[in-house]
C-alpha cells in the first residue's frame, strides 16, 4: 500500500512542481502538497490510491 506522510500539512501555498498522485476519490493531485492539503480538508478520509496520475 502506498502512503504519503501528511503530518506537516496543511500548508498555505503549494509549489507548482508536477509529481502527480492519485487519490482514493479518483482525482489526480498535481503534487504531494496539494494532495496533503486535500487529505486535511477531508478529515483524513482521503487516501492515496497510487503514485502517478489516475
From Swiss-Prot:
InterPro entries listed in its UniProt record: Bifunctional_prot_inhibitor (IPR051597), Kazal_dom (IPR002350), Kazal_dom_sf (IPR036058), Prot_inh_Kazal-m (IPR001239)
GO CC annotations, alphabetized: extracellular region
Cysteines paired by S-S bonds: 6-36, 14-33, 22-54
SUPFAM superfamilies referenced in this protein's UniProt entry, alphabetically: Kazal-type serine protease inhibitors
This protein's UniProt keywords: Disulfide bond, Glycoprotein, Protease inhibitor, Repeat, Secreted, Serine protease inhibitor
Compartment(s) where it occurs, according to its Swiss-Prot or TrEMBL record: Secreted
Glycosylation positions in this chain: 43
GO MF term set: serine-type endopeptidase inhibitor activity
Main localization (coarse): secreted
PROSITE patterns from the UniProt entry: KAZAL_1, KAZAL_2
Domain notes: Avian ovomucoid consists of three homologous, tandem Kazal family inhibitory domains.
Kazal-like domain location: 4-54
Positions of the record's site feature: Reactive bond 3: 16-17
Source organism superkingdom: Eukaryota
The protein, known as: Ovomucoid
Pfam families: Kazal_1 (PF00050)
Amino acid at each position: 500500500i502506498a502512503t504519503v506522510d501528511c503530518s506537516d500539512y496543511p500548508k498555505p501555498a503549494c509549489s507548482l512542481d508536477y509529481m502527480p498522485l492519485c487519490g482514493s476519490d479518483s482525482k489526480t493531485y498535481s503534487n504531494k502538497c496539494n494532495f496533503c492539503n486535500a487529505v486535511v480538508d477531508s478529515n483524513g478520509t482521503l487516501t492515496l490510491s497510487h503514485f502517478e496520475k489516475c
